[in-house]
UniProtKB/Swiss-Prot annotation:
Its EC number is 3.6.5.-. Its cofactor is Mg(2+). Monomer. It comes from the Bacteria. InterPro entries: G_OBG, GTP-bd, GTP-bd_Obg/CgtA, GTP-bd_prot_GTP1/OBG_C_sf, GTP1-OBG_CS, GTP1_OBG_dom, GTP1_OBG_dom_sf, OBG_GTPase. Mg(2+) binds at S173, T193. The gene is obg. GO terms for cellular component: cytoplasm. It is found in: Cytoplasm. It comes from Mycoplasma capricolum subsp. capricolum (strain California kid / ATCC 27343 / NCTC 10154). This is GTPase Obg. An essential GTPase which binds GTP, GDP and possibly (p)ppGpp with moderate affinity, with high nucleotide exchange rates and a fairly low GTP hydrolysis rate. Plays a role in control of the cell cycle, stress response, ribosome biogenesis and in those bacteria that undergo differentiation, in morphogenesis control.
Length: 433
C-alpha cells in the first residue's frame, strides 16, 4: 500500500430536519389542533482510530465527507428520523488540525477511539410546539439547524516508542532488521528508506517495544530540505531517540562529531522539545577497523563522556542485547512522563481537545443608499435560517426575533424611513414603522 501521511479534507455534518406545520383532521373533530412534529437531528461526523489502517491514502482519494441530513417532521406529531452519522476510520496516530487556525482538534492515539469533529444540526420544532392560549392554531415552525462544516488537515505521525535517527547510510535499517522481524529495504546508497519502517524489538527478558526507522536526515531538514518536515514530524511521537552514527567515518573523530551535531541541530530547530527527549547514541559499524581506530581518539572519548553511548554492529548483530537493555531502561523512565508534558511549552504540539469556539460576531448594519439597507452577522443569520418566512406566523416570529437583537433600534438611529427596504440575506423587506 502507498504510504500517505497527510490529507486535506472537507467534512460536513447533516442539517437538522424542518419542523412540520399540520393540523388534526378527524371525523367529529372539525377544529383539530396543531400536530406538526419536530424534525430529526442531522448526523454528525466522527473520526475513529483503526489499528488495521496504516496510511491516509483513503482520505487522499476522497476529500469530502458528509453525514446524513435529519428528516423533516410529519403529521400526527411524528418526529423526523435522525440523520445517520458518518464515521471516518483513520490509522492510530492521526492528528486532526483545523486548517484555518492550525490548531489541533484531536489526537487519535488509541485503537477504536471515537472523536466527534462536526456536530449535526438540531432538528426544527413543529407547529404543535408553539400552541398557547393566545395562539391555538399556530403556523409557526423552525427549520433545522445547519450542521457544522470544516476544512481540516489530517496528519499521520508514526506511533512508536523509539525512533532511529541519523544521516543516510548510518545503518538504521540494518539495525532495525537485527533487532526485530521488520524487513526494510537495505542498500548502499542514500535515502534507501523513504517511509518510516516499524518493528517490534524484544529484550532477553521478553520485554517488547516498538521501534521506528525514520528516513535519513540531511542538513536543512528542519527547513523542509530533502524530505525534512515529512520525516521530522514522526520523531515527535517517540519517547526515546536513538541517534545512529556511522563510526567508520573517513575523517575520523571530526566526521563523527560533525554528523552528531548536524542531526541534533536539525531536531532542535524543528522542535525545541526534541532536544529534551531521552537519547541514546549508537555508534554503529564497529565491526570495521576504521570505526575501532576512530573511537581511540580522545576527542571522541571526551565529547561523549557524559552521554549514554553504546557501540554496536548492526550487520554482525554485535552488542545488540546491551542496546536493547539500555533502550528499555530509558523507556521505563520516559513513560512516567506523558509526551505532552515534555512538549508543554511547544504551542505547535499542544494537545488540544477538539472544540470549535462559537464565533461572537457583532450585528452589522449597512446604508446602501437609494433607500436600501442591509443587516448581517452571525446572530442575524441564525434567525434567518431558523424561521423561514413561508407563513404569516413565521414572518411575525422572524420580525420579533430581529427586534430582540436591537437591530431595529439601530436602523432607526441611523435614519431608516418608512418605505425603505432592508435586505436580510435572501430576503428584502419593506420598512413599515
Amino acid at each position: 500500500m502507498k504510504f500517505v501521511d497527510s490529507a486535506d479534507l472537507i467534512i460536513k455534518a447533516g442539517k437538522g430536519g424542518d419542523g412540520a406545520v399540520s393540523f388534526l383532521h378527524a371525523l367529529f373533530v372539525p377544529n383539530g389542533g396543531p400536530n406538526g412534529g419536530d424534525g430529526g437531528d442531522g448526523g454528525s461526523v466522527y473520526f475513529q482510530g483503526d489499528e488495521g489502517k496504516h496510511s491516509l491514502l483513503d482520505l487522499k482519494l476522497q476529500k469530502k465527507y458528509s453525514a446524513q441530513d435529519g428528516f423533516k417532521g410529519d403529521i400526527k406529531n411524528m418526529h423526523g428520523a435522525n440523520g445517520e452519522d458518518k464515521i471516518i476510520k483513520v490509522p492510530v496516530g492521526t492528528i486532526l488540525y483545523d486548517k484555518k487556525t492550525n490548531t489541533i482538534l484531536a489526537d487519535i492515539n488509541e485503537n477504536n477511539k471515537l472523536v466527534l469533529i462536526a456536530k449535526g444540526g438540531k432538528g426544527g420544532k413543529g407547529n404543535a410546539r408553539f400552541a398557547n392560549s393566545r395562539n391555538k392554531a399556530p403556523t409557526i415552525f423552525e427549520a433545522g439547524e445547519l450542521g457544522q462544516e470544516f476544512e481540516i488537515r489530517a496528519e499521520l505521525k508514526v506511533l512508536a516508542d523509539v525512533g532511529f535517527v541519523g544521516l543516510p547510510n548510518a545503518g538504521k535499517s540494518t539495525l532495525l532488521r537485527a533487532i526485530s522481524n521488520s524487513k526494510p529495504v537495505v542498500a548502499d546508497y542514500p535515502f534507501t528508506t523513504i517511509n518510516p519502517q516499524l518493528g517490534v524489538a524484544r529484550t532477553k527478558n521478553n520485554d517488547t517495544f516498538i521501534v521506528a526507522d525514520l528516513p535519513g536526515l540531511i542538513q536543512g531538514a528542519s527547513l523542509g530540505k530533502g524530505l525534512g518536515h515529512q520525516f521530522l514530524k514522526h520523531i515527535e511521537r517517540c519517547l526515546v531517540i536513538c541517534h545512529i552514527i556511522d563510526a567508520s567515518g573517513n575523517f575520523g573523530s571530526e566526521d563523527i562529531i560533525k554528523n552528531y551535531e548536524l542531526i541534533r541541530n536539525e531536531l532542535k530547530a524543528y522542535n525545541l522539545n526534541l532536544e529534551k527527549r531521552a537519547e541514546i547514541i549508537v555508534l554503529n559499524k564497529m565491526d570495521l577497523d576504521e570505526a575501532q581506530l576512530n573511537l581511540l581518539d580522545e576527542k571522541i572519548i571526551n565529547y561523549f563522556k557524559n552521554k549514554k553511548v553504546v557501540q554496536i554492529s548492526g550487520l554482525k548483530k554485535e552488542n545488540i542485547d546491551q542496546l536493547l537493555f539500555m533502550i528499555y531502561e530509558e523507556l521505563k523512565i520516559a513513560k512516567k512522563q506523558p509526551l505532552w508534558e515534555l512538549d508543554k511549552n511547544n504551542d505547535q504540539d499542544e494537545i488540544a481537545i477538539y472544540k470549535f469556539e462559537e464565533q461572537k460576531e457583532d450585528i452589522q448594519v449597512y446604508n446602501k443608499g437609494n433607500n436600501r439597507w442591509e443587516i448581517a452577522g452571525e446572530t442575524i443569520f441564525k434567525i434567518y435560517q431558523k424561521f423561514p418566512i413561508w407563513t404569516e406566523d413565521n414572518l411575525l416570529m422572524f420580525n420579533e426575533k430581529l427586534k430582540e437583537t436591537g437591530v431595529y433600534e439601530t436602523l432607526v438611529k441611523k435614519g431608516i424611513k418608512k418605505g425603505d427596504f432592508v435586505k436580510v440575506f435572501d430576503y428584502e423587506l419593506e420598512w413599515t414603522d
